[in-house]
Design a protein with these regions (language model features):
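Gly/Pro/Ser/Thr-rich low-complexity, intrinsically disordered segments predominantly at protein N-termini
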Residues: 1-176
Length: 176
């Protein structure tokens, strides 16, 4: 299947991702992971709007990160820098490329190997920072393309580094 064929699928109430041409149905998020995803998106949006840094996208937003075979992934929240949005222009279809920041919130039915696969795909496609939020342990793992991984606890500071200049919050804020 191609990204265009995925785009043309009728809306049947399910979310899908396309991985190397293979359609994968994504189960709906649970209450707690959904709340964490919304908290991340809200905190990001507030900062991004205040400093006019770009666009924050919701969980349904597809990013076409590979072609032939196509891969379209949808993180739980994402940020795309203003200069990239201006260069690309708006699109009603999938964003052509990776976000600058991808946020993945781990649900109870997620397998960590699949989450790690997504992290690797984001980084390989050009994502500059990935946050993986684990609601059950109230921790966040951050991943960078250079291989740097950090594990942050509730009272640690989560920051946007060079991807989101000036963004800082306590990890516990996204789990509130």
């Amino acid at each position: 299947m191609t990204a265009e064929e995925l785009w043309q699928l009728p809306d049947n109430g399910y979310r899908y991702e396309l991985v190397a041409g293979e359609l994968r149905q994504m189960p709906p998020s649970g209450f707690l992971p959904g709340t964490v995803a919304m908290n991340c998106g809200s905190l990001l949006r507030e900062h991004v709007r205040k400093y006019d840094l770009g666009v924050v996208c919701a969980a349904e937003t597809g990013f076409k990160i590979r072609q032939n075979p196509d891969t379209v992934r949808a993180p739980d929240a994402a940020f795309v820098a203003k200069e990239r949005v201006l260069a690309q222009g708006g699109t009603e279809k999938f964003w052509p490329g990776a976000p600058d920041l991808a946020v993945e919130v781990v649900s109870p039915n997620d397998h960590f190997d699949e989450v790690f696969e997504k992290v690797q795909e984001w980084l390989a496609a050009g994502t500059r920072l990935v946050w993986v939020a684990l609601p059950r342990t109230k921790t966040v793992m951050t991943y960078r393309p250079n291989g740097l991984v950090k594990i942050l606890q509730e009272n640690d500071e989560l920051n946007g580094a060079d991807v989101l200049p000036g963004f800082v919050c306590r990890v516990k804020e996204i789990f509130a």
